[in-house]
Amino acid sequence: MFFPRTSQRLLGAIFILLTIIPAAGAATPLHKVVFVFAGFNERTGYIFVAKDLRFFEEQGLDAQIVQVRNGQVAVSALAANEAQFYSVSATGASLGAMAAGLDLAFIAGIVNKLDGDFVVAPKIAAPADLKGKFIGIQSIGGGVWTFTMLALDHWGLVPERDKIQFRIVGDQAVLAQGLISGTVDAAYLGYTFSKVVQRQGFRVLQDLAKVDIPYQGVGIVARRSFLDQSPDVAERALKAIAKSVAYFQDAANKQSVVNILMKWLRLPQVDDAVAGQEAMRTLYSKRIFPTVEGVRNTVRILSRIDAKFAKLKAEDLVDERIVRKLERDGVFK
């Protein structure tokens, strides 16, 4: 077909324009954010899912997911603005930084109660049998220590009085090995690693989710100064998280979630990942508001070991501005 020269030039211009527009759109840079976490278990699965399924990218974010050795390292990363978000429980590390004046706040709550298994050696039949025993933890004041202290408090046990000793072992993969080797007599474990040691003859003294202890089990912490400066970035990040939680809770996505957990947690058997997926599917909160009552419960426990925590008010440690906006926008429906 013949086109006049003017028409040919016009078509050429249109072609160039149509090729430039998608290229410009594709070249739009993603905004980099860093999520840090210390606990190595299924509780962080919502971040793994959001990363692997590109929910962050859908929100224009290049999310880097970084595991750190402990809460102190994570808090230092936030303080230095090397990370923007910290997936964490209400612990001595996170609340300690708040007590010291760092402008941190819980901006979302993913699990709002204590959960996980308190796993013990076969010789331990009841909570009273923990007296005089060694309990494995990751760090004093960290997540596993806090979970353990809340469980002991529930059972009326006091470490000093009952001669219960804490032994710093490592993250949950290492804690599981510590139980198997006999280094410790008991330890808090998430459901995936609990399954691993149960196959070795260890028993679950208590599934802590069944005793309904209020706690900010999994939350997201950020600096208030970051929220003030970049509220849109925080909003987009929490939108991706909310979508991940909803995906996690949909039974139709079970196999996809299991595969993601197996990859990130390097689990040896599918059953271990299934245990984590099933637990988090019911424990994750679709309406991702932080729990003031759960934070208050931790402040109470921490005040026993350090008076600096007694001055904290739980209401001052949460910032709901982003999740309230998401709720108004219908994100949690």
Give the residues covered by each predicted segment.
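Pocket-lining segment of extracytoplasmic ligand-binding domains
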Residues: 92, 173-265
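Short amphipathic alpha-helical segments at helix boundaries and their inter-helical linkers
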Residues: 83, 87, 280-294, 325-331
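Bacterial N-terminal signal peptides
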Residues: 11-22
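Bacterial N-terminal signal peptides that target proteins for export
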Residues: 2-12
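Predominant activation on well-ordered alpha-helical scaffold segments within soluble catalytic domains
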Residues: 21, 48, 95, 149, ...
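Short, glycine-/small- and polar/acidic-enriched structural segments
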Residues: 27-171, 175-181, 185-191, 205-208, ...
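Secondary-structure end/capping motifs
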Residues: 228-310
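Conserved C-terminal helix/tail region of periplasmic/extracytoplasmic solute-binding proteins
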Residues: 299-333
